[in-house]
Amino acid sequence: MKIGVFVPIGNNGWLISTHAPQYMPTFELNKAIVQKAEHYHFDFALSMIKLRGFGGKTEFWDHNLESFTLMAGLAAVTSRIQIYATAATLTLPPAIVARMAATIDSISGGRFGVNLVTGWQKPEYEQMGIWPGDDYFSRRYDYLTEYVQVLRDLWGSGKSDFKGDFFTMDDCRVSPQPSVPMKVICAGQSDAGMAFSARYADFNFCFGKGVNTPTAFAPTAARMKQAAEQTGRDVGSYVLFMVIADETDDAARAKWEHYKAGADEEALSWLTEQSQKDTRSGTDTNVRQMADPTSAVNINMGTLVGSYASVARMLDEVASVPGAEGVLLTFDDFLSGIENFGERIQPLMQCRAHLPALTQEVA
């Protein structure tokens, strides 16, 4: 099973709590995180894109770096780990993304890929005057389908004459092309999102579910597997989890309860309000899971809370789910969390037993 880190491009990572570590996103922090992840044989690093935060006492995600420029910098200071940036496709023409991706492919030596998102948070785009209207909620995957076709043209032949409802290319050129086939990833959980991933993505992200229920996402992975079978492609699921680990189950649980007790209710209220704006995409979208009150303090990603041995066991359970090819991990404290994962959790995981021994220390 592949292991990735979801780098904290926004302030405070993924805990919406006054009791959680409070920090600003910086290049130096993310460099330290990704270099440490590479040292511990993580397979990939991904950054999201967020253009407006949730506010509240913690000013959650009000402070964000930009994904492509951050990952270009990280590509230059790593050597093995795969690097993925996220394109907010309403903000960037596909021909520009194609060229930026080809550039980072050159920087990284063929280790770069692109995560495509349609955009769900209306205020991110309204503030710039580029929100296309609420009809976009029901047409966003039509838009993304045209977008990725332009990308594939330009990365493949270096030329596109694509004509569609949203994009018109007229002998559009990009050169040089990427040195290896460019991977495209997506995070669709709605039927439309999975249908898109089945046709165009190399793999699809989905949310884990619940606290210490590592296989609860299995129906989502099964839906993705079924959608991919209909297109004759192999599109695996990569599952998002937060790891909160300590020496004992009780110590880890105490940290989790402490974070929940400090939940930033103002920021969470804003998230809930935004989740209700899209009335056209159905009930199975990512944002509706994020806003579910069950575990909103970490946007309802699956949460693994326990001793190092307990977390290792639960991750092996994740690996046993058909269609699950990897996990994307966040941590309550990224630097110590990755070190503890590499030193204390990963060596206990049967699904990572193939890894070579560590040979050097990392700062």
Curated annotation (Swiss-Prot):
<dbReference type="InterPro" id="IPR050172">
    <property type="entry name" value="SsuD_RutA_monooxygenase"/>
</dbReference>
<protein>
    <recommendedName>
        <fullName>Pyrimidine monooxygenase RutA</fullName>
        <ecNumber>1.14.99.46</ecNumber>
    </recommendedName>
</protein>
<feature type="binding site">
    <location>
        <position position="115"/>
    </location>
    <ligand>
        <name>FMN</name>
    </ligand>
</feature>
<feature type="binding site">
    <location>
        <position position="124"/>
    </location>
    <ligand>
        <name>FMN</name>
    </ligand>
</feature>
<dbReference type="GO" id="GO:0006212">
    <property type="term" value="P:uracil catabolic process"/>
</dbReference>
<comment type="similarity">
    <text>Belongs to the NtaA/SnaA/DszA monooxygenase family. RutA subfamily.</text>
</comment>
<keyword id="KW-0521">NADP</keyword>
<dbReference type="InterPro" id="IPR036661">
    <property type="entry name" value="Luciferase-like_sf"/>
</dbReference>
<feature type="binding site">
    <location>
        <begin position="49"/>
        <end position="50"/>
    </location>
    <ligand>
        <name>FMN</name>
    </ligand>
</feature>
<feature type="binding site">
    <location>
        <begin position="140"/>
        <end position="141"/>
    </location>
    <ligand>
        <name>FMN</name>
    </ligand>
</feature>
<dbReference type="GO" id="GO:0046306">
    <property type="term" value="P:alkanesulfonate catabolic process"/>
</dbReference>
<dbReference type="GO" id="GO:0052614">
    <property type="term" value="F:uracil oxygenase activity"/>
</dbReference>
<dbReference type="Pfam" id="PF00296">
    <property type="entry name" value="Bac_luciferase"/>
</dbReference>
<keyword id="KW-0503">Monooxygenase</keyword>
<comment type="function">
    <text>The FMN-N(5)-oxide reacts spontaneously with NADH to produce FMN. Requires the flavin reductase RutF to regenerate FMN in vivo.</text>
</comment>
<keyword id="KW-0560">Oxidoreductase</keyword>
<feature type="binding site">
    <location>
        <position position="190"/>
    </location>
    <ligand>
        <name>FMN</name>
    </ligand>
</feature>
<keyword id="KW-0285">Flavoprotein</keyword>
<dbReference type="GO" id="GO:0008726">
    <property type="term" value="F:alkanesulfonate monooxygenase activity"/>
</dbReference>
<dbReference type="GO" id="GO:0019740">
    <property type="term" value="P:nitrogen utilization"/>
</dbReference>
<dbReference type="InterPro" id="IPR019914">
    <property type="entry name" value="Pyrimidine_monooxygenase_RutA"/>
</dbReference>
<keyword id="KW-0288">FMN</keyword>
<dbReference type="InterPro" id="IPR011251">
    <property type="entry name" value="Luciferase-like_dom"/>
</dbReference>
